[in-house]
Amino acid sequence: MNPLASTKSVRHVLMALAAITSIFLTVGCGTSGSSIPPLGGGFTNASLKGQYVIAQTGIGVNQAVTSSDPFSETIVFTADGNRNLNVTVDDFSQDGALLIPTLPLTGTYSIGSDGTGSLSFNGSNYAITMVDDSHFYVIEQDLFATASGFGEKQDTTAFTAAPSGNFVFKAHNIDTSSRVGGIDITGGAITGTEDFLSLGLLSSNLAITSAVSMSAPDGANGRGTFTLSDGSSFNYYVVNSGKFHFMSRIGSLEIGQAEAQTGGPFSAATLANNNSYVFGSSGDTSLSGSVAIHSAGVFTTDGSGNIIGGTVDYVQDATVNSNLTVSGGTYTLPANGGGRGTINLTLSGGSISPQIFWMVNGTRAYFLANSTAAVEDGTFSLQSGAPFTALSSQAAFVMDGFDVAYKDRVGLFKPTSGGFNWNQAANSFDVNLFGNPTATGTSGTYQISSNGRVAVTVNGVTSSLVFYLSAANTGFMVQEDADIGGAFTQQASQ
């Protein structure tokens, strides 16, 4: 097919021409799709086999090639286990328009033994790191765009009907809003309650209903549609019977996910005495814009509505709030609230916005930070494995944020006797100089606290990275010399 039949591909071609001057002026900028030196493992090209969905957000040159603007994107592809891709969905939203290329598209991929690899299709290049055969982290590595996200395998047997049952969701509309809530889906009709946060305002607790019920998903790619009574309309993308992604189909940048709610009824005792929970979140601020806040921490509950300990790190608008002690606080989780609760942490030497959360199950929740200065949302989960003494196994990670440019990273770290080895693919996107894809192999050191807070130095990358472990080699991170953060997950044994 003619690649110029795709509006998005027109941007690729025009941007390639516009970037030639930048390439000549930027010596040693790296090359798109650079490979990461392998750390070891048993992954192969056959590890990526089946149908997958990617949800990602980023920033890139717009269709008119007049400015660089945020975007949201959802991609569905099939990998044959032998380096070939077939892309059946590429929904791309930027500047108030949903852009869909002529489909299907073909492409290629490669997976190294350590799970790092690349995807290439429709003029775009991506670096990925496998968590296991069904999940991977991903960034876009192009001169005209950078992005980060997550990919997971679809269960195509779940494409027979719209999702059904009780679900908890979270969604983010870049620079605009966050929302979390609980819904019931019956025969495609949606009813429920959400907490909706608009930038500059405190959140509102609202009823949520569908104006147009969820359609049955496409039998080939798992995509369906629905419209809410507030006028927002979405494509949704089935992962399995208990999870789906969704993204605006009317030009906003809103993108989110929903998971089946299990483990109820919930109460204050659900967050049991002496249980610790690790959280990670990110968002946009009224002062600095996109990806200008990243937060992570751990807090301990008493099962009766009180917070009895913890620590928090966050960076907001380039202001670092490091290793703040949780000296107290309160939480609510009413027995008749459908899993909705609140958290107020009291910090020594600082403060943090209250959280409104919805329990996905008995150990994990989605939340938003209720603040007029930012739209921030994230996840918290029950911590296991404490007290911690060391990092012990290879883990995949993904990061995004901003320092002097927009940054996205994906890769691996592997503990050693003296610290760890760290391999990353990255993209640094300056709105005036465009992208700078690179690959880096380095080493680092760390100091771990028993509560799972880890102070990390990555040589040549940062001396101010902080991990919070929700389990061994899994958790969230904040880079404290920049507005950058992310998540990491222990790789499955191969």
Q: Language-model segments: which ranges?
A:
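C-terminal motif of bacterial Sec signal peptides marking the signal peptidase cleavage site
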Residues: 24-28
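Bacterial N-terminal signal peptides that target proteins for export
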Residues: 2-17
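Mature soluble binding/inhibitory domains
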Residues: 29-494
